[in-house]
């Protein structure tokens, strides 16, 4: 009897893990498709049917990044591509890739790559 209860408990934990994993994957897909717009933690948590705190814990568990770190990495990749392929203004690239200000974009860029967007473009 106890063995069956333990197995049932284990199955419930596995089901919860699968559900959390699927929810985080849905959030990742949503970020990749919508990175150009402002995305809040609340929006992502609601999409995953989780509280904000639980969502952030699960997201970090599966991606090893916070949701904001992940969003910034997706946005940085897009910005790096635009900086390499176009002559568009840095401000326009920042805004078009979902950053809400030039100063935040430059700060995230420097933190992630060790140089400013302009320095990156020159090299």
Name each region found by the language model.
Residues 1-15, 19-26, 54:
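An amphipathic alpha-helical interaction segment
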Residues 3-5, 52, 56, 106, ...:
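Intrinsically disordered low-complexity regions specifically enriched for long asparagine
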Residues 16, 20, 33, 48:
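Residue-level marker of regulatory loop/turn positions in helix-turn-helix DNA-binding domains and
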Residues 25-43, 60-106, 122-123:
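Terminal helix-turn-helix DNA-binding modules in bacterial transcription factors
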Residues 43-52:
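Helix-turn-helix
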Residues 110:
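Short acidic-aromatic loop segments in the C-terminal HATPase_c
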């Amino acid at each position: 009897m106890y063995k069956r209860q333990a197995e049932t408990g284990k199955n419930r934990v596995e089901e919860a893990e699968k559900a959390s994993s699927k929810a985080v994957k849905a959030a990742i897909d949503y970020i990749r498709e919508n990175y150009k717009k402002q995305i809040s933690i609340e929006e992502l948590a609601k999409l995953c049917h989780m509280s904000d705190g639980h969502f952030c814990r699960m997201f970090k568990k599966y991606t090893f990044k916070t949701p904001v770190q992940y969003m910034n990495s997706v946005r940085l990749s897009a910005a790096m591509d635009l900086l390499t392929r176009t002559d568009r203004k840095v401000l326009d690239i920042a805004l078009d890739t979902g950053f809400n200000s030039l100063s935040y974009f430059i700060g995230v860029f420097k933190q992630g790559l060790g140089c400013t967007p302009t320095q990156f473009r020159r090299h």
